């Protein structure tokens, strides 16, 4: 699977800094991204798939800058992204046409046939000619996932993939992800979906607050959230809680273990 490397990445939106000197090397087959809204999770995924370019620094795939010719080709062939909102991603009016979009090397008729065969294999033959506009939000999200699966990139970037799904939909997606042989980089607020991952990054206002094994990083983030809630409910205890928060950060900082990145 590809090696993704972010070197001294800076990103600003307007006057708001998103990342300042971000350094990461992403090699594990399962990587979770957690943190509050606005922490930088979606921005990181958009940088990795080339939808945004850093103001400073570089992003490489297997040693090639993704914004140079060789790296751009590698990125387009090896990285796919599923957006949080499927309406930001879907282009075509029917399911089969949307799936065929992920097969650019084939003639239209061949691509549509492969899309129909793929849907049939998954018991969804009746979806082929369904109008996207007739699908629920969760069903449209499932179409985006199926399009990625059929296209077959080596690395899948998933931004809040469970957000629009009902419980059966979440179970189906989790089953697919568990069986996948691709590299998965998953941003989520549902920590149980990444808790067992070999690597989880906790982002906080564009900084890597913690970087390590899934169980440890998820537990540290949950403890931090509990402290924030308790502090809001009992302001008089804030000094004690602030001290506890500092001890949590010390136990799980981004540099607290042999780093995964250079």
Across the structure, where does each feature detected by a protein language model lie?
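Conserved beta-strand-loop-alpha-helix hinge in the C-terminal portion
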Residues: 207-230
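Catalytic Walker B motif of ABC-type/P-loop ATPase nucleotide-binding domains
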Residues: 156-160
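Conserved ABC ATPase signature
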Residues: 131-135
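Conserved ABC ATPase "signature" region
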Residues: 109-127
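Conserved structural motif at the start of ABC-family nucleotide-binding domains
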Residues: 4, 18-21
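Helix-to-loop junction immediately C-terminal to a conserved catalytic motif
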Residues: 49
